[in-house]
Each structure stands twice: as C-alpha cells, then as structure tokens.
Amino acid sequence: MVKELEEQREEILRLYQELKPSQRAFSPAPHKWNLLQVLRHLVTAEIQSVAYINKKLKSRSGIPEAGIGSYLRNLLLKTALKLPFRFEAPKIAEVKDKHPDFETMISEWDTVRKGIQKLIEQSDEATLARALYRHPKAGMLNMKQFMEFIEVHIAHHQKQMKRIMKHPSFPAE
C-alpha cells in the first residue's frame, strides 16, 4: 500500500511541477481553494494524522483492538469520499494561508511519508492492527485503514484539482 500511495503522490507532484505559479494559485471562486491550498490540506492531514499515531504508539498500553466497528466506519468513510459530494475540511486540517509555499509543502510531504514508512517498519503487525488513528468523522482506525483513508482522501481531492483546472477562467499555459 505504501507503494501505491507514493505513486499517487508522485503523480500529484508531477502535475503541480508542470504548472505555472499563477495556475497553482488560481481560485475558481471567492472562498474556494486554489491548487496550493488543496495540497496544503493533503499534507496537513497526513502530518496531523501521523503525529496522532506516534502519540498513541508512545503510550503503547491501552490501545484498543480495531474491530468490526472500525471496519464498518472505514467502509463508510471510503464510500463517502468516492461519492461526488463535497465535505468541509475538519478544523484540524483547515487551510488558512491563501498561497502556501509549494517547495515547503513538497519537503513536508517527503518527511511525513518517510515517517509513515518508519512507523510501519518499526511496528509489529499486532500493533499496526490496533486502533492507532482517530479520523475526525470515522473514529478509531488501524494502520491499514489509515493508509486506505489516505489513498481515497487523495483521490477525492484529485477530482477537486481536475475541477479547478477545468474552470473556464483557469490561466492558460
């Protein structure tokens, strides 16, 4: 799953690197995110998520098993993100900066992805199967479910990226 997530990330980075700064900063309407803000949201969501998982892993004791409830909540979450609806970002992953720095976000995303890889390598399967991650809406999920969430979350926002770039006022190359 790490490989698939990395391929997805590389696809987004290739796309963004091909765009001009004015295209990355284009907002389709007032109070709507531009491409930089979409990327900021994705990177922030992963940073906050990994920080929470690391905090849970430090306590080690009292981490519950991820049971059928986690499975069902994850299924609902993945289904919701595949639907053509738009959701307001949870406060923890809100984007306040209108023009986040692209290079900084690339660096942060590299770092958080290395952190995910390290987490997986340094944890045994029994630990990774526990409810380590708290999604703001879906509740507690295990590491595999967290990775699945990242994948569908990014795919959800890739649709948003395409909508922004198809906007009639999107700057020409």
Give the role of each language-model region:
Residues 28-75, 126-173:
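Short, contiguous alpha-helical
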Residues 9-17, 47-50, 54, 113-121, ...:
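Structural signal for well-ordered, non-membrane alpha-helices
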Residues 1-11:
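Extreme N-terminal tail/first-helix region
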